[in-house]
Amino acid sequence: MRRGISVILLCFALFAGAQTTPASHPRETVGLALEGGGALGLAHIGVLQWMEEHHIPIDYVAGTSMGGLVGGIYATGMNPGEVRELVGGIDWDGVIRGQTDFRDLSFRRKEDRTEYPAAFEFGLRHGVAFPGGFNSGHQVGLILDRIALPYSLLKSFDDLPTPFRCVSTELTEREEFVFQQGPLSDALRATMSIPGFFTPVKLNHKIYVDGGLLDNLPTDVVKEMGADHIIAVHLQGAKLNAETPLSSFSVLGESIAAVVATTERRGMAKADTVISVDLARFGPTSFDAVDELIAAGYAAAEANASALLPKRLSDTEWNEFLARRQSRRIPSVPTPQFVQVDGTSPAVASQLERRLKSWDGKRIDPRRLDQQLTEVTGLGRFSAVGYNLVEKDGKVGLRIHAAEKEYAPPTVNPTLIINGSDYQNVLFAVGARFTFLDIGKINAELRTDVLAGSEYRAAIEYYLPLSAYSGWFVAPRAVADNAPLNIYLRDKRLAEYRQREANTGLDFGYTFNRFNELRFGYEFGWLQYDPDLGDKSLIRAVSGKQSFSRVRYSLNHLDDAIVPRAGVALNANINFYDSRPGAADQFPEMDTHFQFFQPLRPNDSVFFTGSGGTTFGYSGTGVPMFTLGGPFRLSAYGNNEIFTNQYFLLQAGYLHQVTQLPPILGNHVYLAGSYEIGKAYGIARSQRLPMDGTLGLVIQTLFGPAYIGGSYGDSGHHKFFFQLGKIF
């Protein structure tokens, strides 16, 4: 590994044995060993390109981590240009971050991520347990499955167009393991499984992680394969400056780097030719520098031309060599005659087989299959889903391996909420959502929410599908809540009320797809508004029972739960109150919220949101139903400064991505600007239109979005605020 990088970047540097019987060669055979190094490993493509241009044959190839990936792709018969095209088309940022895309989540998992936007979860399946890695490996696994699919039925990696090996670290025996057979995609995943970052690969009761820990430059493996002349490609990163200040994490990272560097020196000592690629100006996460890295590898090979050119073949010999390699390449994938799912319970496997039955007798389209399997992970049950071909009873079938989360259910989604719109009275709460699966029936869910701090809340819902193959469901639920209702005039807090309620209800609904849902329900219980501090005459102190029927429609086509860049969302609620404390009579109520986001350039987008609510002219509702004031509700105004029974609020804004955090810390950082204008009806100041402009930074952290900004509005309203938690 490389000096001068943090422990996280070091981990990326890890990214990258039996004697085989070689084919008969009238010449000295050549073996290539490729070192691990995260994005630095892309330089191997340049080395391969130079060697092919100069007719240097590669009879054997072995690699570790990223070297294993590049070597494995090349071993399937792709030429360096094809390898370059493949790796250049990978969304490395998405692969590294590892989260299932928001658009691919089921509707209920979209609700989870929207309401609990922290970027991590844990489980209680065997006590408190976290995932085996920051990244489940699903996205990278699909890439490897696609590469390896034509070679699924090979018995040995010796039968690939170029014989291949890759190195992994096996944890149960604490030793190096060399993959030479089995599913190629599993082997590539294992050699790249950075400890703590990617979830380990479990095969046949063994646990595999990145091979760079024990053998980052496997020249010994190439020798055992039968190579006469061994070429090692060493990725020379930046060295540690003795004057560089080190944190405890840096010391740990550099210590691991020293251990791995020892394996690299051992590998170089066993090579006949060493190609050392100068990559000091790059880092193990420099995936956006594909062309520069490839060029560096090419230049390093050129610098070693005097050692390499003696292995050059004549044009005739080279064409014969390519023809032999091409003859071992499998050009097409057999059409599967059945679909088989494993890794989960028989009942769940049966559902997945029915869901994927369309592939029975149909040619595999890897992109469409990848999309379907990603949507399966979006159900929340599986950490990763992969595929390969299997043979049974003389027929070729599509095997789907669904890896259930080892730590869940129940799944725990934590939340941390900070509202600093009044820096003298910061509101703070912590909580979590607990989701239990298959309670009483397959696919049934028990969802429990708890929150404590400035607000105390407990809620429970039992989601019961009426059929495994339709969207109809029933959902009994109950909630108890004790929340602050602080009332302001500009920056001055006039009063603090508590809104306490306890309700139970039943919904009947239909989930159309992963984007929208319709519910009909009835809810009844108790509601109280009680003043704690300040002016007790601002709103009525009421207490009593409430009951209402409701219709709710939700649509979510956004591309992100935290800071969307594209898509639309709509939430519409219609309630009819039979009773409510302080209300003179029964009355209807409706409120809606609409969002639209449109990207303009890769780092820029605009958005428009609209909200509105009405009681259709009924004023005797007890406490007014809606409030305006506070972040994203007229940000320059004090919290709940305006009470009303009818309003509208329009917002238009601009988002510009300023930078991007390392995956372990969060995601994007945006500069956000917006203009808000609204109208509240039925109050003395209703003739004017309250408005403001807001500017701030939105930072996507592991604990959810942090928003820091200020707003200036009409009539002298202005405010500085910060908050952590849901924004849009």
Task: Give a label for each model feature.
Residues 79, 88, 169-172, 182-184, ...:
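Solvent-exposed coil/turn segments that connect beta secondary-structure elements
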Residues 2-9:
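Sec-dependent signal peptide recognition
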Residues 367, 372, 386-551, 558, ...:
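Gram-negative/organellar outer-membrane beta-barrel architecture
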Residues 19-64, 72-385, 389-390, 405-406:
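Patatin-like phospholipase
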Residues 397, 409-423, 448, 537-538, ...:
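C-terminal outer-membrane beta-barrel translocator/porin domains of Gram-negative envelope proteins
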Residues 238-240, 247, 309-325, 525, ...:
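Acidic/histidine-enriched alpha-helical segments
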